[in-house]
Amino acid sequence: MSIADVEYEYVVLKINGYDISHLSRYEAVQKFLQSKETLVVEIRRQKHNALDLELKHGSNAKISKVDNPGELSVLTDKSAEGTITAASASQQINCPSSTSLKEIETKTPVVLTLRARSHEDRLGSLQAASKETQTQSVVGTDVLKDNDLVNTITDNFIEHEHHLFEQCLEPEIDIEEVTLVKGVEQSSSNQIGLIVTSSGIQQSSTDTNKGDILGNVLEHSEDVFISGVQPESIAYRDGRLRQGDQILRINGLDVKNQEELETQIARSSTSVTLLVSRILYPEDDDDEDIHFEYANTFLPDDYTNVVDKLDKVLLTHVKSLEELSNKSAMQSDECYHIPEKNSSDSNVKISSLAKNIIEQSTKSCSKIKLRPNANLDYKKKFNLPLSQEEVHLQYEYDESEHIYETIPEDSESEPVYCSPYQRSNDKTSIGCSSPIASRPAESLERTMQQQTQRVAQWLGLKPQYQKTRQTLVGRPPPLKLVQQPTCSRVFTLRSTLTNTSASSSSGVAYSSYGQNNVVTGNAAAPGEEVDNSSSAYNTGDSNNSASPHQNTTNPDEAIATGRKLDSTVIDSPNDHLDATGVSTMLLLPFGKSGRIGLCSSNLPTAYVSERYTNVGSENEIHPLKSDIEILRVKPTDDSYSHCPQFNAPNLSSYHFVSSQEVANRCHISTSLQKNATLLNGESAEEIPMVWKVKRRPDGTRYIVKRPVRNRPQVALRKNMRYNEVTTTEDDTISEVKIGRYWTKEERKRHIERAREKRHHQTQQQQQ
């Protein structure tokens, strides 16, 4: 602990005879706190001064201690020791002590004794501490000089005594008076610039020049705090007011509420005097130590948000793949103009180039998917503009990450359902100009597709490649789009989660794409209803999601258009190769009410061109097959073997449909007992099941399957319960008893009175 003034600086050597020069700051403070008796402190002068030259002759003076006659202090020529006797204080000590102490030779032994009064007296007056000089009565000029020196040093200690106790016995709450003087100029730099707030949430800012109060006062409160200081204002330049200070008084008046404070500040024209209180935390000084480290630290120094890190990695991969794809597109475009006589050489070059591209993309992108338009033949793609060959870069999520949409509490909006993951069943290929190079590209595309499609399809990240089949009762076939619009937006983790949670049930926007802006008909059968509610709580009109295909033209024209497009565009060996378009919303297993869409760079208007393959046209022409064929999972072809089945936990065998649909299907299945089978393999002769919505204790809802209740039996049980005779027996103890309890004798009297009353009534009727 150091005691500093203008001329001298003393360091503490001992406390009650215990050497603290080797202790740390915290341990020295604890020694002060643990001292319950009279505190004796030995100090040493640390600085040289010109007065030392005048004290050479007094080096052999021996000065005794009056208060502690039993303690003998040995004073040598190389040390100047003193004692400060003060009452032990009980206040909390927050003392920034000095570092390692240095012994500096001095020529004068000095003994000082300071007696300090109570803490309240010290706050009332700075001169409250009494001073005593304990010296020997030795006649001589040197001793008188020593007395003058002692008086000077003691005066300096008394002058800075409040500073000493602020350092060592700092109070928990600091009270300070601050005077802010306004300027004459009417500018923003001459404003007080305090933003005050009370116990309410809303804040108000005071402009002291014009007297205008900006903001609203929420409520009256006794406690008014400073919530902020405006930059380049009077309070900001003063530097004494901090955020969190409580304003106790203004211009000598107690602050009652926020409105009164703002009024007083607005009325003051020259200066404002504020009395503020501030809570002092003892650990503030420890926070200034730059070498301080936590023993058990969980976060690294360079810790940032994990989501932001993933986004940065994603954008880096996207940029590298864009350059790679642009380079390959330019080189493949040059190969188109090679003469036919050099076609064999060009094929070899293109194939080697494609292999290099595949190797580079496999190494550089483990999380990014390169997906160009794969369904068009290379001859047809040669005639398309280069802008339509942009790649679609998508983000791959972890295979173990299962994402399920929750059921919203709002009954007016269409609920989002959990659905089992569906595997990829179709072959795709990277669109390159050489048929030789398309084979390894197909394998790469298929491998990447298997890894990325399972979870990302429910977040709207990429389309799902699947066969045309129906998995739900009464649902239309998935729409097949020949041409895929490209997407310029990179779906990062943060933006994807935000778009998923903010998706609405009013449908998705569509846009026209490229040169083929042909709006085709509805893919549903002619006799199919447009209702898209396939939930377990179908309430009729509550599902108001707009169907994206309600603006259809003549179905015959749509069929003709689909056939024409199929005959002109599909020219590849894989006749059944069909790719999805626009977004995953067209392939959701819940029909036409998709909800998550993708943005596209060249989709200017509100509708997208939709062209159907031959499979989609056949589904339009032929009516829906029987329920048994709809519910049965059709066998897969050879292409299915490349895609392993991915079984999602707990939901892989469930298809969420409405209870009315299940009841209707069960009724139909009873009439078709030959080959009737349900989704889970139960026979139609068993008890029919319906979906029920259950509620957990935490408020969340889930769907379970329960047997259909027999309504006549329920009504019969209710009637039997209501027709029971009311008694006081134990079998009806659960019923509510109203009225007093009559004893057995009283009930007998009641029966007799009733009997007499009936007898009297019969007599009157006979007369």
From Swiss-Prot:
What is the scientific name of the source organism? Answer: Drosophila melanogaster
Biased composition regions of type Polar residues, renumbered to the chain: 532-555
Q: In which tissues is it expressed?
A: In embryos, it is expressed throughout the CNS and in several peripheral locations. Colocalizes with Slo.
Bias (Basic and acidic residues) ranges: 744-755
Task: Outline the extent of the PDZ domain.
Answer: 202-280
Location of region: Disordered: 521-557, 744-767
Primary role: May selectively reduce calcium-activated potassium channel (Slo) currents by reducing the number of Slo channels in the plasma membrane.
Spell out the InterPro entries in the cross-references: E3_ubiquitin-PDZ_ligase, PDZ, PDZ_sf
Q: Which domain of life is it from?
A: Eukaryota
The identity of this protein, by name, is Slo-interacting protein 1
One Gene Ontology molecular-function label:
potassium channel regulator activity
Oligomeric state and interaction partners are given as:
Interacts with Slo.
Pfam hit, one: PDZ
